[in-house]
Structure formats: structure tokens, C-alpha cells
């Protein structure tokens, strides 16, 4: 399985809009995907999520920072770098997160679940919403 995990990590680190078409090499047909905004099943639905990423963000890319493999289960930690396309700030953004994968016997992904803090890692960086989120966080910590 470690060879399959290495291929998966390299695939995500080198992901492009064109390589999304190769998802069937890495996901089973009925693969499950969940992140803070989406919960879908099947390659076409997963491809739509990644296409949307490229349509709405500039320079999105993943850097895998760690991996733990236990049988068919994999935990990848990563940094996701991007620039907001529709905001004045052109500053490079980073979201830190983790992905729990469950692999099929052939090494393809049958379950992909992303974990990251949408409030801290995304909402707090948005104009208007970010100020509100930071204020709410301060109030909650009093």
C-alpha cells in the first residue's frame, strides 16, 4: 500500500485542471468524499468539487507534509496554498488540514474525508465575514 500512497500524494501535489480527468486511476467509481462544504459520492461529483476549486481560486496547490499508513487507512497532513480570485487581496493564503483515506484492495481511494477548520482557516480571512468571525471568537474566549 505504501507505493499506492506515494502515488496518491504525488498526484495531489501535482494536481492540475487537466489531471482531474485521471481521477478514475486514483478513486473507485463509488468513492465517498467529504470536506467542510461537500459530501458526495462517485468520481463525477468529486471531479466537480476540484474543478470548482480551479474556477474560483488562483494558483491552488497542495503540499503533503506528512503521512501515516495503517493497512488500508491513510492519514495525510497537508498545506493548501492559493490566492483568492475575487477579492482585492492578492496575498498567498494557506489552509492546514488533514485527509483520512480508506483504500480499496487495488490501492485506489474508496473514502476521502478532509478535516480542516473552515472558521479559522477560511472565514476569518474573508472581507467583512472575517471581522465578524474574529469578533465572535474573541467574545467566545472571554
Segments predicted by a language model, with ranges:
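Short, charged low-complexity linear motifs
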Residues: 7-14, 36, 64, 97
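Soluble or luminal CAZymes and related metallo-dependent hydrolases
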Residues: 3, 7, 45, 93
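A beta-strand edge to alpha-helix "cap/lid" segment located at domain peripheries
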Residues: 55-61, 65-142
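Short, mixed-charge, low-aromatic patches
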Residues: 1-10, 35-36, 54-58, 110
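Short acidic-aromatic low-complexity motifs
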Residues: 2-26
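A generic structural signal for ordered secondary structure
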Residues: 10-11, 23, 50, 93-99
Amino acid at each position: 500500500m505504501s507505493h499506492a500512497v506515494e502515488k496518491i500524494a504525488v498526484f495531489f501535489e501535482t494536481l492540475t485542471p487537466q489531471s482531474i480527468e485521471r481521477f478514475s486511476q486514483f478513486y473507485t467509481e463509488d468513492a465517498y468524499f467529504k470536506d467542510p462544504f461537500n459530501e458526495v459520492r462517485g468520481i463525477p461529483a468529486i471531479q466537480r468539487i476540484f474543478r470548482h476549486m480551479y474556477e474560483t481560486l488562483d494558483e491552488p496547490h497542495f503540499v503533503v507534509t506528512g503521512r501515516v499508513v495503517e493497512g488500508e487507512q491513510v492519514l495525510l497532513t497537508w498545506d493548501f496554498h492559493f490566492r483568492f480570485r475575487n477579492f482585492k487581496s492578492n496575498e498567498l493564503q494557506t489552509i492546514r488540514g488533514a485527509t483520512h483515506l480508506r483504500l480499496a484492495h487495488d490501492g485506489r481511494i474508496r473514502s476521502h474525508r478532509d478535516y480542516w477548520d473552515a472558521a479559522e482557516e477560511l472565514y476569518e480571512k474573508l472581507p467583512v465575514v472575517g471581522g465578524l468571525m474574529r469578533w465572535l471568537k474573541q467574545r467566545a474566549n472571554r
